[in-house]
Amino acid sequence: MPSDPLYIAYDPVYKHPLPEDHRFPMLKYELIPEQLIHEGSITHHQLHRPRACPDEFILKTHTRDYLYQLIELNLSAREQRKIGFELSDLLIERERIITQGTIDCAFAALDKGIAFNVAGGTHHAFADRGEGFCIFNDFAVAANLLLAQKKAKQILIIDLDVHQGNGTARIFEQEQRVFTFSMHGEHNYPFHKEKSDLDIPLKDGTDDHTYLSLLKHHLMRLIERVKPDFIFYLSGVDLLQTDKFGKLKITMEGCVQRDEIVFETAHRFQIPCVVAMGGGYSPKIQTIVEAHCNTFRTAIKIYNLTS
């Protein structure tokens, strides 16, 4: 029998226990696959549980000192506040599993064309530190592994979370084989921006028309210029007008059209693509889940994937 065309990395540990008043919407990691299964977009057997990412893979991107600080739960209170989560063995295991999920997706995408991690997109993690709810930079770890194993020669990271992928930009600032492209809120976190290979800062209140026009223009130019043979796509939904921190005016339909542009481009040029969910902080969890589910639905339609 042919292999299933739809590959999704997911583990129940993605939903990590947090204090009740914590602002991170951890529940979404449980609700996204539940909704997609309930509506028939996917089935249980398309969810693949990653193992924990080994030190060997992490150390291709992160420093040994940082990794051992995490293993020994030896970050200061200030460093933990910058990350936004209290360190624990359970949390570090979760982050390893999410990172391995993106690695598994990368190898699946080489075969299937596209693969999804229900979590991931931890683009604020630097080689030697974490911040902004990010501990290991899963895209960077997976990209470095693909390069090391000669599975890709030229990688394009498309970061459409509303916050700049500062950790990713810094990690790859001297790496010619990885091109970092970020469209993000100009006046949003992180307030000190790193230099991506291409940054498109967006004014507060940017609407669908402006956003989608910019994305179409720059993405096509990048495909021609960079000639990527692999894409990592961070499909954050914190660009929505409902988001508590986004500051943009992107509608739900505009968010769908954004995904369509990326997926149609990757599909048309037959470039393997890994998708990770990134951020989303709308007040209603249903809005966040619907926007993330739309990303799956859009890809399923464009790639003609079936459950």
Feature-to-residue mapping (PLM):
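N-terminal low-complexity, Ser/Thr- and acidic-residue-enriched intrinsically disordered segments
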Residues: 1-53
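A general "terminal functional-core" signal
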Residues: 4, 77-307
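Glycine-/proline-rich flexible loop or hinge segments
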Residues: 13-18, 52-56, 78-91
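ATP-dependent kinase catalytic cores of phosphoinositide-metabolizing enzymes
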Residues: 41, 74-79
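Acidic carboxylate-rich catalytic motifs and surrounding loops in phosphoryl-/glycosyl-chemistry enzymes
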Residues: 44-55, 274-283
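Charged, often glycine-rich, active-site loop that binds/positions anionic groups
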Residues: 51-75
